[in-house]
Each structure stands twice: as C-alpha cells, then as structure tokens.
C-alpha cells in the first residue's frame, strides 16, 4: 500500500573471525625494557602477555584475515557483502582503510568505510551496520574491529605500555526473521575526553613569511588510569542495567557477559555490580591485553570456536573508552558452534 513503512527486519549474527599480531611479548620480556615485573602487571591488569605487529604486518592484513575467517564460518562469500564497516583508530591510511580491506577480500559489491570510536568502536559499528539491514537497504554486512595501538604507545611509560596489544575481530551480520540485536544504548561525553586520548602533534613550522602550519602526526597515548577506571565502573554497569531493563531481561537470564577487555579489575567490578557470576564473564586479557576496537569480536570468536558460546546464547556486551564513549548491546548468537 502506498505510503506504508517498510518492515523492520531482524539482524542475525551468523559468523565470527579473528586475527592476531605476529609477535608475543610477555610481561617478563617487557620488564627488560621498563621497570616492571610480571606480578605487578598481572595483579593490576590481569594481563600476562600481549601481541604486537611486526613492521610488515599492516592493519589491513589483520582486518582482512579476521573478515575472511568470519565469512568462512558464516558460509558466505565476499561477493555476498553489501557493507564493510571497519572500526579502527589506527588505520594504515588516515583517509580510510576499509576500502583496502574490501579489495583484499574481493568484496566487489560492498561499500566500505571506517568508523572511529576507539575502544567502543566495534559496538558502535555493529549497531550502525544493523540499521542498514533493518531498513532493507542492505542484506549482509561485515563488521570488523581492528587496531594496532602498539604504534602509538610510549614503550618507556610503564603505566601504559603494559596495557595494549594489536589484533582484529569480525562478525558477519545478515538480515533475518530472527533478531540477534535485541537492544542497544550508546553514549558519548566529550567534556570528559581528556582522561584518555591520542592527541595530534601541536608543533608548528614556518610555511611562508607571516604564516605557519601544524605538522602532521600524533603523540603517544595519554591516559589517566584512575579516572578511566572510575568512569568504567560507574558507567558500564549503569548502561547495562538500563539496557536489560529496557529489554525486560534480568541479569540471571544472561549466558555471557562480553565486555571490552580493558582491565580484569574492571571486568570483575562490572560483573559484581550486575550480580553476574565470574564463570559467565568472558575474558582473554591474559593472552592479548587491550586491543581496543578488536577486543569484543576477538573474544567472541575465541569463545565460539572453543565451544563456550553456542547458537542461541544470550550475551550482554559493553564497549567503553576514549571519547569518552560507551554503550551496550544485548545480543543473541545465531552462528554455528
């Protein structure tokens, strides 16, 4: 009938994939560079090692590998894709790396672009991609979270260099009668953004007589760890509780809590405030550290492949980080197990 709104479609989460950086750096190895030790790092962060890309391993390499793996699990070809969304803060090309991922995959029918929201990036990208599918404008999307924060870490600052690693994770979304994105909430607060950022260089250079310009490039990551912790343990439980209430779901109905892998203390505090038992909290911090936009899909893929997450499982997920940005999504996994 003329003027009738199109049906709102469900969004199925049907495949996952991940990719790891080539080099493994243990806490003991890192202590050879900075004044730290394994016990100090583990007790404060839960991290035992992290992966760091080699000089010839690009972000596109990691993102394409994760995407290819997700497509294989989903049983879809690159040509089936209508959309590729790459959540990253560390593109190989500042103008965008998603088109290069599209080319590497051979996804000739897909439009591809980057989305930057730091450690919340994957969750924001997942929600964004889902809207294209819900309207019927697109049928299938590949959402990738990938970062190489090792390029922007001050490796002589023991407070921050122990935290970060490189990696990528991906999920295939498909329009479906059964909805796998049951609800979401997203937030930003730029007024508090100074507690965690990766600022551009502020040095100037002469251009012509009477004029100057600011040189390109970025300074290392700047972080107030105490303030970031307070932000996370306050906002993440609150947004998850609000989402569960909106979706009429109780915490004890959840199969898994899938959080951004920033710090084990944060994961434990959020779970405690939600009364979610530790056995339901997914964590791979010990092996990978904080891989920024990659943490959620990388953790999901690992849990799917080792059999912890099964088709039909209900997951509450939250991403949080620089911006400040944070959000939550209630997901039902529909891929193979």
UniProtKB/Swiss-Prot annotation:
It is found in: Cytoplasm. One of its GO terms (biological process) is fatty acid biosynthetic process. Its main location: cytoplasm. Disulfide bonds: none annotated. Keywords: Acyltransferase, Cytoplasm, Fatty acid biosynthesis, Fatty acid metabolism, Lipid biosynthesis, Lipid metabolism, Multifunctional enzyme, Transferase. InterPro entries: ACP_syn_III_C, ACP_syn_III_N, FabH, Thiolase-like. It holds the Pfam family ACP_syn_III. This is Beta-ketoacyl-[acyl-carrier-protein] synthase III. The lineage of its organism: Bacteria, Bacillati, Cyanobacteriota, Cyanophyceae, Synechococcales.
């Amino acid at each position: 009938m003329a003027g009738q709104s199109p049906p709102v479609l469900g969004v199925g989460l049907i495949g996952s994939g991940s990719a790891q950086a080539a080099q493994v750096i243990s806490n003991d190895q890192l202590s050879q560079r900075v004044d730290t030790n394994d016990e100090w790092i583990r007790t404060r962060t839960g991290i035992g090692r992290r992966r760091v890309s080699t000089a010839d391993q690009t972000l596109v390499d990691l993102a394409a590998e994760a995407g290819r793996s997700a497509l294989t699990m989903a049983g879809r070809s690159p040509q089936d894709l209508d959309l590729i969304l790459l959540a990253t803060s560390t593109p190989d090309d500042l103008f965008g790396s998603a088109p290069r991922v599209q080319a590497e995959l051979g996804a000739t029918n897909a439009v591809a672009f980057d989305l930057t929201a730091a450690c919340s990036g994957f969750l924001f990208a997942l929600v964004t991609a889902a809207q294209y599918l819900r309207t019927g404008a697109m049928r299938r999307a590949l959402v990738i979270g990938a970062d190489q924060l090792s390029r922007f870490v001050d490796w002589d600052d023991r407070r921050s260099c122990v935290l970060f690693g490189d990696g990528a994770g991906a999920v295939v979304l498909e329009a479906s009668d059964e909805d796998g994105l049951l609800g979401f909430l997203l937030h930003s607060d730029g007024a508090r953004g100074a507690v965690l950022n990766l600022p551009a260089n502020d040095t100037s250079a002469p251009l012509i007589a009477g004029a100057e310009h600011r040189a390109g490039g970025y300074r290392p990551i700047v972080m107030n760890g105490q303030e970031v912790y307070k932000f996370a343990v306050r906002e993440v439980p609150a947004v998850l509780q609000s989402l569960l209430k909106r979706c009429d779901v109780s915490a004890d109905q959840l199969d898994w809590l899938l959080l951004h892998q920033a710090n084990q203390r944060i994961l434990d505090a959020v779970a405690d405030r939600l009364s979610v038992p530790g056995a339901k909290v997914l964590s791979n911090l010990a092996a990978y550290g904080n891989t920024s936009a990659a943490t959620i899909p990388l953790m999901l893929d690992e849990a799917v492949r080792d059999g912890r997450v099964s088709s039909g499982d209900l997951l509450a997920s939250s991403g949080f980080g620089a911006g400040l940005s944070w959000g939550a999504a209630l997901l039902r996994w529909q891929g193979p197990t």
